[in-house]
Amino acid sequence: MMTNLFSVFDPSAIFNLSLNWLSTFLGLLMIPSIYWLMPSRYNIVWNSILLTLHKEFKTLLGPSGHNGSTFIFISLFSLILFNNFMGLFPYIFTSTSHLTLTLSLALPLWLCFMLYGWINHTQHMFAHLVPQGTPAILMPFMVCIETISNIIRPGTLAVRLTANMIAGHLLLTLLGNTGPSMSYLLVTFLLTAQIALLVLESAVAMIQSYVFAVLSTLYSSEVN
């Protein structure tokens, strides 16, 4: 039973090529169209969303943030949001439900922040290990706690996104598997529940991409 449930997350292969991962890059096919087509209402709405995110990330980074650094986090948000939504369509591989992708996004970002901070702002990074007002007797323990909490950050970022994507898809799969054994009346309620769950999954897709980008921005602001 569990094998069948999780089989929707298995990347299949054709001619020894894992073609499912190509769904991650489908968004690249849509980017060139904005340069030669007249902007539609959807483009205007999307541009306003990106502008709002730019202002928010710039506020989170503070005055010490480098110019243009917000585009990294906006691109990260766009990539995760696109793949989260693509995973909601039938027969499209959900790449963000795999730690292979989420950890590949979180770990290099965290490593870059840490290397930049410890090389250029060493004293500032040491000061982060001991919160202000900590009693002297607790300082060694706080250093250990802060170090561990810092090390697990990329893991928590990746697992949070992966777990949220898997949970919703598993619920949809469970409900879908019960359909053939139900009466027509119960199938109506089942479809209503699945539509409601799909709407909730759309909200989760947006929220999780936003959370991933915001937390990455906050981690970046700590090393400046």
Swiss-Prot record:
Give the chief site where it resides. mitochondrion
Gene3D superfamilies for this protein: ATP synthase, F0 complex, subunit A (1.20.120.220)
Write out the transmembrane intervals: 17-37, 72-92, 99-119, 125-145, 170-190, 195-215
Where does the UniProt annotation locate this protein? Mitochondrion inner membrane
A GO CC term attached to the entry? mitochondrial inner membrane
- Write out the GO MF terms: proton-transporting ATP synthase activity, rotational mechanism
Q: Which UniProt keywords apply?
A: ATP synthesis, CF(0), Hydrogen ion transport, Ion transport, Membrane, Mitochondrion, Mitochondrion inner membrane, Transmembrane, Transmembrane helix, Transport
Spell out the SUPFAM superfamilies in the cross-references.
F1F0 ATP synthase subunit A
Q: How does it sit in the membrane?
A: Multi-pass membrane protein
Assembly and binders: F-type ATPases have 2 components, CF(1) - the catalytic core - and CF(0) - the membrane proton channel. CF(1) has five subunits: alpha(3), beta(3), gamma(1), delta(1), epsilon(1). CF(0) has three main subunits: a, b and c.
Q: Indicate the family of this protein.
A: Belongs to the ATPase A chain family.
Q: What is this protein called?
A: ATP synthase subunit a
The protein's organism comes out as: Drosophila simulans
The record lists the lineage as: Eukaryota, Metazoa, Ecdysozoa, Arthropoda, Hexapoda
